[in-house]
Amino acid sequence: QFDVAICETVTRSRSQIFDHASEAMNTVMANYEGARKAAGREGKFSMRVIDSKQIFAGQGLLAAHTLRLINQKVSKNTLRHEVETFTDKIYTCVIPRDLHYIRERARRRGDKSLSAMAAFMGKVLNINPVIFGQGVEGKPVAKTRDFNVAVEKVMNYAIGRLEAGLLTPYVSLSCGLSWTEIEELPGLNRLRDACEKHGVELLLSQMGITSS
């Protein structure tokens, strides 16, 4: 039905999905002509697998930006270039509630960036850090002893960046909470108001089990 397919995966540094998708792409590209002919389609088909270089909400932002470019009917080469360039311009804030849980999940994936002592002290002292970074490279930029305080800090930052001007008219927010808890997040309604005022779409979602 389509002439071009784009698959954007979670960062290849934390998952094998990119490699598996690339293998699938090679199979598709080697065998698509028969299926395309049977469907009555003429011309070539192309497929591209792109490493989003993102985890959590960053991948959703890239998907929204990609769809926007497609709707603008940019050329195939321009689309590929713009998407791959944009992956290096996405910044993410993460607020983990349980550092010990985060460490254990990361350790099973070979990531030893968070020490056992840091995770233990964070849990004992009820510290909720705000981690900020580009792609998967992040570092703590704030530490609070209240989850809601950390959330409000991030909401305030998001509103500030929104008012300063964004490269794409989207803000992606993904939460490992129930919808009731999400709606009660401090600063969420102010963020919604700021998005509406500046013509920005808020992409609000529950975090999938593989992320949370």
Regions found by a protein language model. Name each.
Residues 1-24:
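Class I S-adenosyl-L-methionine
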Residues 2-7, 37-50:
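Glycine/charged-rich beta-loop-alpha catalytic/anionic-binding loops adjacent to active sites
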Residues 17, 22-26, 33-39, 48, ...:
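Mixed-charge interfacial surface used for oligomerization/domain docking
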